[in-house]
């Protein structure tokens, strides 16, 4: 599974990041996983819906399981994958065509994109579990990135 690493930007440059479109950020700490959707808004500069809040997710089952959350967020890819699988089963497309079209689906704007951020206490097992769940949910764009200072503060409040 390819992971996308963002380019390192020098601290003194004043480049605004692109708008987050259909993005979920997972933050791993100890054996816990937290997430937020969309852009990060600190308490000092809240967005339209207020500052960003972290929600805890789990790798088990239930309403807040990573698998269930990803399935609901990535329904565009999952529904279209089912259509492609039907065509593959009926021999209307080749398996190489299926793989290419599925790969194209995961890169469309409607497909969910995931940022993975970890602190110093995050367990390797949690990272691997999350990447496994992302693969199961057919998430095509996964980018491990560093925690921002605002995200670190928010994480301290949760731990």
Spell out what each predicted region is.
Residues 1-68, 76-101, 105-106, 143-159:
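Extracytoplasmic juxtamembrane/flexible linker immediately downstream
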Residues 73:
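Active-site and glycan-interaction determinants of carbohydrate-active enzymes
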Residues 102-142, 151:
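Soluble extracytoplasmic domains of inner/organellar membrane proteins
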């Amino acid at each position: 599974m390819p992971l996308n690493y963002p380019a390192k930007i020098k601290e003194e440059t004043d480049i605004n990041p692109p708008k987050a479109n259909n993005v979920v950020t997972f933050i791993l700490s100890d054996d816990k996983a937290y997430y937020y959707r969309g852009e990060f808004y600190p308490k000092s500069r809240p967005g339209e819906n207020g500052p960003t809040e972290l929600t805890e997710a789990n790798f088990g089952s239930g309403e807040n399981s990573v698998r269930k959350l990803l399935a609901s967020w990535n329904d565009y890819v999952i529904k279209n994958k089912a259509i492609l699988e039907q065509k593959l089963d009926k021999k209307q497309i080749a398996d190489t065509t299926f793989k290419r079209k599925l790969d194209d689906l995961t890169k469309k704007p409607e497909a969910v994109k995931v940022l993975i951020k970890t602190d110093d206490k995050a367990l390797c097992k949690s990272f691997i579990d999350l990447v496994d769940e992302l693969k199961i949910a057919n998430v095509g764009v996964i980018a491990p990135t560093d925690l921002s200072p605002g995200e670190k503060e928010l994480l301290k409040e949760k731990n």
